[in-house]
């Protein structure tokens, strides 16, 4: 597939999105830029864009094989990928298997507590409001998504969790929690979009409990570039 790359449509914290000669396809470019604390902390993680691009593409393809529709179309090079153009549903969809991060402060649960069942959370994607947590009643009342869309999103989110947990465990990695984003195709179909990477997931070494994700940057622990490379090595060889 050969699409002509055109003007930049959007630039976010970690990616740039470009139009192409096909109105249904865009090109995503993954950057090394890193932010934390609502954008208060800024920096770079060496080769993060390469890791996130390759890892996300590989995982999206595995999820497709398990019946979860994704935006993935074609990897172009180390940092660029063609994906289906979507209208992003303005919800961050968070699945938690183990207590970590802000959840421990919010709920008073010690970090590392294994939940009996996965927790599904929504936050409203709005930078000005700092992405507040909401429930599905908010989403309906604010017209962020329909009930049918929310049901589909929840179904896919739990399925993604099942598939990813197994993939990660095979690589001796615990899937602690992760954030997903979904989008609508031009016909209204809901598909998985954005990325699946150490930027959007918490990965712990299953033996040592060592962090293998963006928490190393968030907490100024160091070693984040090596951790990202380690995840890619374990999952992609």
Regions from the PLM with identified roles:
Residues 113, 196-237:
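C-terminal helix-cap and adjacent tail motif
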């Amino acid at each position: 597939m050969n699409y002509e790359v055109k003007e930049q449509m959007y630039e976010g914290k970690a990616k740039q999105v470009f139009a192409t000669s096909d109105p249904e396809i865009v090109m995503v470019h993954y950057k090394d830029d890193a932010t934390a604390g609502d954008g208060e902390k800024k920096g770079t993680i060496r080769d993060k864009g390469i890791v996130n691009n390759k890892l996300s593409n590989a995982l999206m393809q595995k999820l497709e094989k398990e019946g979860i529709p994704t935006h993935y179309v074609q990897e172009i090079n180390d940092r660029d990928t063609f994906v289906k153009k979507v209208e992003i549903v303005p919800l961050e969809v968070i699945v938690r298997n183990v207590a970590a991060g802000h959840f421990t402060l919010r709920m008073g649960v010690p970090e590392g507590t294994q939940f009996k069942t996965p927790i599904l959370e929504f936050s409203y994607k709005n930078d000005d409001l700092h992405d507040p947590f909401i429930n599905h009643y908010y989403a309906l009342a604010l017209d962020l998504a329909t009930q049918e869309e929310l049901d589909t999103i929840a179904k896919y989110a739990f399925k993604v969790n099942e598939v990813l947990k197994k993939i990660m465990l095979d690589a001796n990695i615990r899937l602690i929690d992760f954030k997903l984003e979904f989008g609508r195709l031009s016909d209204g179909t809901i598909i998985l979009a954005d990325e699946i990477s150490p930027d959007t997931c918490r990965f712990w070494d299953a033996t040592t409990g060592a962090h293998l994700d963006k928490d190393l940057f968030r907490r100024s622990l160091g070693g984040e570039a090596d951790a990202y490379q380690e995840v890619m090595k374990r999952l992609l060889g």
